[in-house]
């Protein structure tokens, strides 16, 4: 059985796709301290850069533009392979290397506020466009690979994450990831 130290997971690369950007600076400050590379989508990327932090836009990272009026932004194998790869699996490591993909260790996503929009409009088109596809898919991928990937879905989780991340010197504990 692996010891506690073996169960911590160093975070080197993160993807952020946030509707609620209210506490983003708290996360960015911590990620910068530990030299975590950040990938982010459109509005999140703009906010990160506005705050003076570095990031790479999803479209630049995947070398694939957003398509279908923004309906397809984060649905790309380079992201999902990086999130889902089993770090201890030699074949997975080889496939990542062969495809020039990196492991993604941290997924921070807030979903579109569908319920809020539903309360404020009955406009069918607006409702349909606020059904989040990419966000939940990123979260499900990270949850499936919790042994290697940390996932946050609410700014309410940031302080607890930072506490665990700092305690483990740039890693997260298996207990936190569960």
Predicted features and spans:
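Internal alpha/beta core interface subdomains
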Residues: 9-12, 101-178
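Short, basic, glycine/proline-bearing loop/turn elements
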Residues: 10-14, 77-84, 123-124
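Helix N-cap/beta->alpha junction signal
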Residues: 20, 41-42, 89, 135, ...
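Glycine-rich nucleotide/cofactor/substrate-binding loop typically near the N-terminus or early
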Residues: 43-114
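A generic local secondary-structure boundary/capping motif
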Residues: 3-6, 69-73, 93-99, 127-130, ...
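Short acidic, glycine/serine/threonine-rich loops at helix termini
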Residues: 26-28, 49-53, 60, 66-70, ...
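Short amphipathic alpha-helical segments, especially helix-boundary/capping motifs
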Residues: 2-5, 18-23, 70, 113-117, ...
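N-terminal glycine-/serine-/threonine-rich phosphate-binding loop
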Residues: 2-38, 43-61
């Amino acid at each position: 059985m692996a010891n506690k130290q073996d169960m911590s997971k160093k975070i080197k690369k993160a993807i952020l796709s946030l509707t609620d950007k209210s506490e983003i600076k708290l996360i960015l400050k911590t990620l910068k301290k530990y030299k975590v590379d950040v990938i982010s989508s459109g509005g999140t990327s703009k906010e990160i850069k506005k705050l003076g932090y570095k990031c790479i836009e999803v479209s630049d990272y995947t070398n694939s533009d957003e398509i279908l009026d923004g309906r397809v932004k984060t649905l790309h194998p380079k992201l999902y392979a990086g999130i889902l790869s089993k770090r201890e699996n030699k074949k997975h490591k080889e496939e990542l290397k062969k495809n020039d993909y990196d492991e993604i260790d941290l997924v921070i996503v807030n979903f579109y506020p569908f319920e809020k929009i539903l309360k404020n409009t009955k406009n069918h088109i607006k409702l349909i466009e606020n059904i989040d596809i990419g966000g939940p898919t990123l979260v499900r991928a990270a949850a499936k690979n919790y042994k290697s990937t940390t996932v946050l879905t609410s700014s309410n989780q940031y302080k607890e994450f930072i506490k665990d991340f700092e305690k483990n010197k740039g890693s997260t504990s298996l207990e936190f990831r569960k």
